[in-house]
Design a protein with these regions (language model features):
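Gram-negative bacterial Sec-dependent N-terminal signal peptides
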Residues: 2-24
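C-terminal subregion of chymotrypsin/trypsin-like serine protease catalytic domains
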Residues: 26-60, 77, 84-100, 199-333
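Post-signal peptide N-terminal segment of secreted/secretory-pathway proteins
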Residues: 69-80
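Extracellular/periplasmic catalytic domains that process cell-envelope and extracellular macromolecules
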Residues: 80, 87-89, 127-132, 145, ...
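Catalytic-histidine neighborhood of serine endopeptidases
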Residues: 90-91, 95-133, 143-146
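Extracellular structured ligand-interaction cores
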Residues: 91-93, 103, 130-137, 174-176, ...
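Short conserved beta-strand and strand-loop elements enriched in small hydrophobics
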Residues: 102-116, 168-170, 177-182, 248
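Chymotrypsin/trypsin-fold serine protease catalytic domain
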Residues: 135, 139-240, 262-271
Length: 333
């Protein structure tokens, strides 16, 4: 069992019981077709990239709401395939929570289990754990080519501290009108009164997605979502959804951004999820530590063909002879 210390002990925080165990899960409503949540997570059916104003109906055909009102459906393939525990924000970097210490590689692309499908394992070479918060930005051993990275939320640079967004930043509906999430693991259905919970499958078999309840409290390093699971395609993240992405639509930049990664919940009967907000300071330090600077000291090099089967590579203090083809000699072939 994991006890989080990613936030200051406010009244709200102290009343959120935090548990993060090894089994993954996601809780959704039981009165709509479950396929909605699966298709959403994989951009299938009516949830294709760029789709807007998607109507949702319950099992009796009654409308329960509209997903993505006048907003484009994001590409959710940025989450690691099948598990969804990490998100690609750079061709060689992913974001997740540092208490996810058990995974050493990720895959990206379609979630098909077709044996003819080939998926590459991108190995983690450096975990880049944040020294204070439940966040890390691991580096991968190769550049990911299957998907395009999602931009990072940059609201952290909209204030003087430069370390995190101002308090209440994600409660600004003008800037952030909509959030979505995706995750994997043991899947549950829950009735509206909360009395009936149905387990569907064990962990890591497929992804589900939808909206992450509603933002309730927002600080400089975490944001709390809570509310009614029966808000259209509401989803409540459970322990093993740790590290799964929180995507926000940034109305100022007119695009979807990675806002945070799921860190905590407050029980199978609860309704509170806390996400660690993306930490740009930690990411920039990781970039600086991983990058190598090569200095040529302003030297000048010249390479001259001598015309007799050799050439000279000349610097200010050294000359190297390099054999080349002598075009004046006829070929023996």
């Amino acid at each position: 069992m994991y006890k989080s210390n990613i936030f200051r002990p406010t009244f709200i925080a102290l009343n959120v019981a935090v548990m993060c165990a090894g089994t993954q899960a996601s809780m959704v409503r039981n009165d709509v077709d479950y396929q909605y949540f699966r298709d959403f997570a994989e951009n299938k059916g009516q949830f294709f990239i760029g789709a807007k104003n998607i109507p949702i109906f319950d099992k009796q055909g009654k409308s329960v709401g509209t997903m993505l009102p006048n907003l484009p459906m994001p590409d959710l393939h940025v989450a690691s395939r099948v598990s969804g525990v990490a998100t690609l924000f750079n061709p060689q970097y992913i974001a997740s929570v540092k208490h996810n210490g058990g995974y050493g590689s990720v895959q990206f692309g379609e979630n098909s289990n077709n044996p003819d499908s080939h998926h590459f394992d991108y190995l983690i070479t450096d975990r880049n754990n944040h020294d204070k918060y439940d966040f890390h930005s691991p580096r991968l051993h190769k550049l990911v080519t299957e998907v395009t990275p999602i931009p990072l939320n940059n609201i952290a640079f909209d204030n003087n501290r430069k370390t995190g967004p101002k308090n209440g930043a994600f409660l600004d509906k003008e800037r952030y009108p909509y959030f979505v999430r995706v995750g994997s693991g043991r899947q549950y259905l829950r009735s509206k009164d909360g009395k009936e919970k149905t387990s569907l499958t064990s962990a890591y078999n497929y992804l589900t997605g939808g909206t992450p309840l509603k933002p309730n409290s927002s600080m400089d390093n975490w944001v709390l979502f809570s509310g009614d699971l029966y808000e259209t395609l509401g989803t409540y993240g459970l322990p093993g959804d740790s590290g799964s992405p929180l995507l926000a639509y940034d109305a100022k930049e007119q695009r979807w951004v990675l806002a945070g990664v799921l860190s905590t919940f407050n029980g199978y009967d609860g309704k509170n999820n806390i996400y660690t907000i993306i930490q740009p300071d930690s990411i920039h330090r990781a970039f600086e530590n991983d990058e190598m600077t090569v200095s040529l000291n302003g030297s000048t090099y010249s390479w001259q063909n001598q015309g007799v089967g050799k050439s000279i590579l000349q610097s200010s203090n050294q000359a190297v002879e390099i054999p080349v083809t002598n075009v004046n000699v006829a070929s023996k072939d």
